From Swiss-Prot:
Described function: May act as membrane-anchoring region for structural proteins during virus assembly, or play a role in membrane association of the viral polymerase during replication.
Family indicated by similarity: Belongs to the coronaviruses ns12.7 protein family.
Pfam families, alphabetized: Corona_NS12-7
Organism: Human coronavirus OC43
Protein name in UniProt: Non-structural protein of 12.9 kDa
Amino acid sequence: MDIWRPEKKYLRYINGFNVSELEDACFKFNYQFPKVGYCRVPSHAWCRNQGRFCATFTLYGKSKHYDKYFGVINGFTAFANTVEDAVNKLVFLAVDFITWRRQELNVYG
């Protein structure tokens, strides 16, 4: 079975539900402004048993000059049977990772 993943050209971007919490975390810890996208999972996809909708987000770092981006830090994907559940799950995972990463980076200075 072919591997399925969400393609950018099919994503619809959203800033509802709990995305404002993710925006706050990205702003607070100096990451690029988040764009959360979602799409329907095709019925023939291997991950269809995880849910009918897929929400995705890629975390990008930002330099102190505010015009250059470091690149991809991590990607997040969450599945659920409704768009709201998928986005909420994604936001929870991403904010948890951002907080954890901040704590670990502070340990090493």
